[in-house]
């Protein structure tokens, strides 16, 4: 029971964390471009 619950939590959090990392990296990249310009 606990293993399935943990696996479900990990599978549910993985895409959210990946999306957060991508969004933060994209925002930082855009900010750097604006500062360079």
From Swiss-Prot:
GO biological process assignments: cytochrome complex assembly; photosynthesis
Keyword annotations: Chloroplast, Electron transport, Membrane, Photosynthesis, Plastid, Thylakoid, Transmembrane, Transmembrane helix, Transport
Transmembrane segments: 5-25
Keyword Transport: yes
Domain of life: Eukaryota
Compartment annotation: Plastid, Chloroplast thylakoid membrane
InterPro entries cross-referenced by the UniProt entry: Cyt_6/f_cplx_su5, Cyt_6/f_cplx_su5_sf
GO MF: electron transporter, transferring electrons within cytochrome b6/f complex of photosystem II activity
Pfam family, one: PetG
Membrane topology: Single-pass membrane protein
Cellular component terms per the entry's GO annotation: chloroplast thylakoid membrane; cytochrome b6f complex
Keyword Transmembrane helix among record annotations: yes
Subunit text: The 4 large subunits of the cytochrome b6-f complex are cytochrome b6, subunit IV (17 kDa polypeptide, PetD), cytochrome f and the Rieske protein, while the 4 small subunits are PetG, PetL, PetM and PetN. The complex functions as a dimer.
Family membership noted in the UniProt record: Belongs to the PetG family.
Function of the molecule: Component of the cytochrome b6-f complex, which mediates electron transfer between photosystem II (PSII) and photosystem I (PSI), cyclic electron flow around PSI, and state transitions. PetG is required for either the stability or assembly of the cytochrome b6-f complex.
Protein name per Swiss-Prot or TrEMBL: Cytochrome b6-f complex subunit 5
Organism the protein comes from: Ostreococcus tauri
């Amino acid at each position: 029971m606990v293993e399935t619950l943990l696996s479900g939590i990990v599978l549910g959090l993985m895409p959210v964390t990946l999306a957060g990392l991508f969004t933060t990296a994209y925002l930082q990249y855009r900010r750097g471009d604006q500062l360079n310009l």
